[in-house]
């Protein structure tokens, strides 16, 4: 079993279609586009951190399932998602129990709120890949309640491992306001995450 099989499954389509519907008025995509972005970032991170082929397989499966907990709401979606993933993967009966445990642990810890969340390579790479997805294309919402104009000016980001630290470069369009970004909900969350990662 691999992540492409999951992405082509009825379960994946139905689950993320429902999440897209639930979060349609929310300014950030947590469905198909986000999952594709997270898998792409994870592939780069897997090379940077030299994950084995087996670890890569588990990482990409975790990426495809990491936000399924949004079916139960935003709060504790990582825990809920890990429980849903365990049920789904166990039912498929295509992976050994120890592999399912690695995937489920990565999903449970993808919030990256504690240093321990980075103790296992698959968990670490999923948490980082998830946080790196703040590019403008993810902000599709037109709900007037949210102003996403500054976020939409983020074109892409690139990252490398330098001196045992991730160096993040953000490419933006003219008019991007870094102060506004740094004091926004996501900017503050990203800074806390990067600070934790550098401990």
What do the predicted segments below correspond to?
Residues 1-76:
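Acidic/His-rich, divalent-metal-binding segments that scaffold phosphate/diphosphate chemistry
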């Amino acid at each position: 079993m691999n992540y492409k099989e999951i992405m082509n499954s009825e379960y994946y389509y139905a689950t993320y279609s429902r999440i897209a519907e639930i979060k349609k008025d929310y300014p950030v995509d947590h469905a198909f586009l986000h999952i594709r972005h997270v898998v792409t970032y994870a592939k780069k991170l897997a090379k940077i951190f030299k994950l084995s082929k087996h670890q890569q397989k588990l990482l990409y499966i975790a990426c495809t399932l990491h936000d399924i907990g949004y079916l139960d709401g935003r709060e504790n979606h990582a825990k809920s998602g890990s429980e849903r993933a365990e049920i789904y993967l166990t039912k498929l009966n295509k992976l050994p129990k120890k592999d399912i445990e690695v995937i489920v642990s990565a999903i449970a810890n993808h919030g990256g709120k504690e240093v321990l969340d980075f103790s296992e390579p698959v968990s670490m790479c999923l948490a980082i890949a998830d946080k790196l997805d703040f590019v403008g294309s993810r902000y599709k919402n037109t709900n007037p309640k949210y102003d996403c104009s500054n976020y939409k000016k983020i074109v892409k980001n690139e990252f490398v491992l330098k001196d045992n630290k991730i160096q993040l470069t953000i490419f933006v369009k003219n008019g991007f306001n870094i102060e506004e970004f740094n004091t926004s909900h996501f900017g503050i969350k990203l800074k806390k995450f990067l600070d934790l990662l550098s401990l």
